[in-house]
A protein has these predicted regions:
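Short, structured "edge-of-domain" segments at secondary-structure transitions
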Residues: 1-192
């Protein structure tokens, strides 16, 4: 949708379904805006994902278009902005408190599809929905990741995150006790 066609901030807004016609049972997991060349990580909670541009998300079809293929029972996640594909990192968290960090450039650039494995989740645990990818964050070396668990938060800089760095599609390592139930992850930009 062109942003200038949306209701102004003075109004009550309006439902997205008034402007698009999603298939039966479909729902929105996120909204993105930006330049057509802006890149995003698109992923599912099954632990798969890829990099795509806003240009590949745009369609003239009111019913939309298929962008990400999700495993049965899986859920597409909110797309995450990439500012520098060659120098940023991807942090993948599971609901079991595992964290894996690797360069975001390790993901393929695709127009649509399932993508490749970001973090390894045992198939039996994934099928039963016991374990899944819960958060994806893209960050740079100067940024800090703030991990919130309940009322507590933990801020980690790049040198503290080195412990969780590994190859894409690995299992990831457990976060410290007390922070394994991750409610929210925030990128605190270091260049501001």
């Amino acid at each position: 949708l062109a942003a200038h066609t949306l209701p102004s901030a003075r109004s009550q807004g309006g439902p997205l379904t008034g402007r698009v016609n999603p298939p039966e049972g479909a729902y929105f997991t996120g909204v993105v805006a930006g330049d057509v060349e802006q890149q995003f990580v698109v992923a599912s909670d099954a632990g798969y994902g890829f990099v795509t541009s806003l240009r590949d998300m745009v369609t003239k079809n009111k019913a939309g278009k298929a962008l990400v293929s999700v495993s049965k029972g899986g859920i597409a996640m909110q797309p995450v902005s990439i500012y520098d594909l060659d120098h940023e990192f991807l942090a993948a968290f599971t609901n079991e408190g595992r964290l894996l960090i690797f360069p975001v450039r390790d993901l393929p650039v695709m127009a649509r599809g399932k993508g490749i494995k970001i973090i390894n989740i045992p198939p039996s645990r994934l099928a039963e929905r016991v374990e899944m990818m819960s958060h994806v964050v893209v960050f740079s070396e100067v940024d800090t990741l703030q991990i919130s668990s309940g009322k507590r938060s933990l801020s980690l800089k790049i040198d503290e995150l080195e412990h969780y760095r590994g190859e894409r599609a690995r299992r990831g390592l457990k976060l410290p006790k007390g922070f394994q139930r991750v409610d929210k992850v925030e990128r605190i930009r270091g260049d501001e």
